[in-house]
Amino acid sequence: MSDAKLQSVLSSLSQVARQLDALPSDTPAPDSSWVKLNTNENPFPLPEIIMQSAIAALERQYLYPEDDNISLREAAANAYSVSMDQVIAGNGSSELLGLVYRAFLTPGDSVAMMSPGFSFNRKLATLQGAQFVEIEFSKDHSLPMEQLLFGPAKDAKFILLANPNNPTGTFVPVADIERLVAKSDRLIVLDEAYVDFAPENGLRLINRYSNLLVLRTFSKSYAAAGVRVGFGFGHPEIIGRLRNIQNVFNMNVIGQAVGISVLAHRAAYADNHRHIRHERRRVTLALSQLGFSVIPSHANFLLARVPTAQDGSWWQSAFARQKILVAVFPDKGLENYIRVSIGTKEQMDAFLRAASRISRILNMSTPPR
């Protein structure tokens, strides 16, 4: 295609598509020699019994997957003690988030989200032509109830809350979330992507409140980011509306098989989760000793304020020169922070060596006062 033809094609892009060019995206690892700590995957392989289910599913790859994910939804209903009509299964929880935006928003509507938050939601709002209302957490990381109920968020079609929050890793007690759900007449979308690393979850609330939708993913705690498995739990009427607009055959046979097997063998991940919690504590202490200010985390990552005048982006580049990827964010107030995923002990040792090396070089180059 000639440049002139390409420009003609690109000029036909919608205004929405052009707006998306300005939104940030994750940095992929150039090759396997890099230490990838920027997207919060679980670093361990699937347990062998679950891997076998994936291999067995490949024998059925010439057939379409089960439509409407009936067997997977039934397995989730049994595992989480809910009814099958309270469950929707998706190609990761990101697909389910997209369904919520499509189902509830039209151009000109607004959605409210706690800030700082998962940047993908800005993209979803833009795709729907919706306004994005960001509500800051209170200084102690609690929910600002007045603002959510009566302030800038009062006209939003729904309120999105991640718990634990990304990118801070902070956790709001479920009792506080219940107070918000009880007092609000709008849909509250509770994204619990990281909840398996937290002290409690809010799933039980869906049987008390019809305006709550809880999202889960197997990408973080269950090491299945590559096969894309997610769930939504809520009132059957809301779940039914979301399933109505879901694509046919939205999950592949491997994702369905792995999802069912994970649900049957969640206990196989106990050591995995213990390791991540242990490394989270160890790295928090080590970073603190290097002068970083680390926000206490209930997720599989840490958000840390860098200890020097250089900002987070500078540190990100310094780590990249040592083949280590960490995340930074454009959000107001996060310019001097980096986020690091919790990986294997070997990965975290490499990260800490790099952090120590960078700090030492900076200290050597700082003139005495």
Curated annotation (Swiss-Prot):
A Pfam family: Aminotran_1_2
Pathway(s) per entry: Amino-acid biosynthesis; L-histidine biosynthesis; L-histidine from 5-phospho-alpha-D-ribose 1-diphosphate: step 7/9
Catalytic activity: L-histidinol phosphate + 2-oxoglutarate = 3-(imidazol-4-yl)-2-oxopropyl phosphate + L-glutamate
Endpoints of the signal sequence: none
E.C. no: 2.6.1.9
Keywords: Amino-acid biosynthesis, Aminotransferase, Histidine biosynthesis, Pyridoxal phosphate, Transferase
Entries under InterPro entries matching the protein: Aminotrans_II_pyridoxalP_BS (IPR001917), Aminotransferase_I/II_large (IPR004839), HisP_aminotrans (IPR005861), PyrdxlP-dep_Trfase (IPR015424), PyrdxlP-dep_Trfase_major (IPR015421), PyrdxlP-dep_Trfase_small (IPR015422)
Enzyme class: transferase
Gene Ontology biological process terms from the UniProt entry: L-histidine biosynthetic process
Coiled coil: none
Cofactor: pyridoxal 5'-phosphate
Residue numbers of N6-(pyridoxal phosphate)lysine PTMs: 220
Any one GO molecular-function label of the UniProt entry: pyridoxal phosphate binding
Cystines in this chain: none
Gene3D superfamilies xref list: Aspartate Aminotransferase, domain 1, Type I PLP-dependent aspartate aminotransferase-like (Major domain)
Subunit: Homodimer.
Family, per entry: Belongs to the class-II pyridoxal-phosphate-dependent aminotransferase family. Histidinol-phosphate aminotransferase subfamily.
NCBIfam families registered for this protein in UniProt: hisC
Protein name as annotated: Histidinol-phosphate aminotransferase 3
